[in-house]
C-alpha cells in the first residue's frame, strides 16, 4: 500500500469506522435472528418429541406440572420473606408462617432494621456495595479484556491458558478459602476490605464465558477491516467489539455480582471487625443473636433484612434479563 493510500485511509478512518459500527450492529441483529430461528427449530423438535405437542396432552400436562412445582419451590422462600417481613415480633412468633399478622409492620420493620445497633445494617449494606462495585466490577473488566484477547489473538501458550481456566473452574472456591486466609494473614491484609476485594477480582468462569462469547459475537472480518482502515487495537475494541459484547458483559457482570453479593465463607474467615462485615455475615450474626438462649428476639428484623438484601438482585435480573438470556444462549448457538 502506497503512502498516499495509507494517508487517505487515515483521513477516512472516522467515516469508515462509523460504517463498520453500522455493519456490526446489523451483524448483531442478524445473529439474534439466527438465535431466534434456532430456538424456534428446537421448539419444533421438542413438539415432535411430544413435550409440547397438543396431540399428546398427557406429556404436555406433566411437563407443565413439573415446571409449576419447580417454580413454587423457587418462589416459596421469597414469598415467606415477603409475608413475614410485614409482621411484628409478637405476630411472627404467634401466627402461621404463611399467614399475615394482625398488624402490617413492614415499614416499621424497615426503619428499625436501619436504626438497630446504631444503624450497623446500613454500614453492612455499604460494605457489600463496595465489595461488589470494586471486586465484581474489576472481575468483569478483567474477564472482558482477558476473554477477548484469548478469543481474537493467537500467541504461544494459548491452549495451556485454556487448560488452566478449565481447571480453575472445576475447583470450588471454598477449597481455596483457607489457603487464601493463610496468605492474606502473612501479608497483614485480613480484617481489611482488601481481603474481600482481591480474591473477588479473579473469575475463571467469567473469563471462560467472555472467551466463548467473543468467539461467537465478534466477526473476525470486522476486526480485519478496521485494522486495514488504520484503527488501533484499542479503538477497534472500544468502538466495534464492545457494543457486540454487551449481552456477554451483562451476563458475566451478573454472575460475578451475585457471587460477591452472596459470598459467605470468605468474609466469615477473613473478617473479625463487624464494621467490615457484608450483609451475609451481619444478618447471620443477628440470626445467632435471636436464636441464642437469653438473646434478644429480633427474628422479624432478620427476616426484613434478608428481604432487603435480595431485592437488588431480583431487580437486576428482571431489568437485564434480555441481555443475560441472550448472553447465555450465544455460546450454545453455532454460527
Indicate where each model-derived feature is located:
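A structural signal for multi-pass alpha-helical bundles of membrane permease subunits
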Residues: 60-335
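Transmembrane alpha-helical segments of polytopic membrane transport and secretion proteins
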Residues: 1-67, 294-295, 321-335
Amino acid at each position: 500500500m502506497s503512502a498516499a493510500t495509507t494517508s487517505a485511509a487515515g483521513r477516512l478512518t472516522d467515516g469508515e469506522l462509523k460504517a463498520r459500527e453500522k455493519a456490526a450492529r446489523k451483524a448483531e441483529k442478524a445473529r439474534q435472528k439466527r438465535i431466534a430461528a434456532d430456538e424456534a427449530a428446537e421448539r419444533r423438535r421438542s413438539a415432535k418429541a411430544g413435550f409440547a405437542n397438543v396431540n399428546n396432552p398427557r406429556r404436555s400436562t406433566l411437563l407443565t406440572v413439573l415446571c409449576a412445582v419447580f417454580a413454587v419451590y423457587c418462589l416459596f422462600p421469597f414469598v415467606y420473606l415477603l409475608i413475614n417481613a410485614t409482621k411484628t415480633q409478637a405476630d411472627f412468633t404467634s401466627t402461621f408462617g404463611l399467614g399475615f399478622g394482625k398488624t402490617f409492620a413492614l415499614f416499621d420493620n424497615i426503619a428499625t432494621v436501619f436504626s438497630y445497633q446504631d444503624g450497623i445494617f446500613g454500614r453492612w449494606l455499604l460494605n457489600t456495595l463496595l465489595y461488589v462495585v470494586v471486586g465484581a466490577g474489576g472481575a468483569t473488566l478483567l474477564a472482558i479484556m482477558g476473554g477477548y484477547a484469548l478469543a481474537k489473538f493467537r500467541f504461544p501458550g494459548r491452549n495451556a491458558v485454556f487448560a488452566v481456566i478449565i481447571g480453575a473452574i472445576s475447583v470450588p472456591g471454598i477449597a481455596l478459602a483457607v489457603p487464601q486466609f493463610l496468605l492474606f494473614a502473612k501479608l497483614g491484609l485480613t480484617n481489611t476490605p482488601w481481603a474481600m476485594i482481591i480474591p473477588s477480582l479473579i473469575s475463571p468462569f467469567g473469563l471462560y464465558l467472555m472467551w466463548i462469547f467473543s468467539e461467537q459475537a465478534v466477526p473476525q472480518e470486522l476486526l480485519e477491516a478496521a485494522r486495514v482502515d488504520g484503527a488501533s487495537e484499542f479503538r477497534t475494541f472500544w468502538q466495534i467489539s464492545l457494543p457486540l459484547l454487551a449481552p456477554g458483559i451483562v451476563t458475566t457482570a451478573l454472575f460475578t455480582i451475585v457471587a460477591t453479593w452472596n459470598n459467605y465463607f470468605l468474609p466469615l474467615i477473613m473478617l473479625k471487625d463487624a464494621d467490615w462485615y457484608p450483609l451475609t455475615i451481619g444478618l447471620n450474626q443477628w440470626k445467632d443473636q435471636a436464636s441464642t438462649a437469653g438473646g434478644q428476639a429480633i427474628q422479624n428484623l432478620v427476616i426484613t433484612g434478608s428481604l432487603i438484601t435480595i431485592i437488588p438482585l431480583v431487580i437486576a435480573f428482571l431489568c437485564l434479563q434480555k441481555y443475560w438470556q441472550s448472553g447465555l444462549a450465544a455460546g450454545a448457538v453455532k454460527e
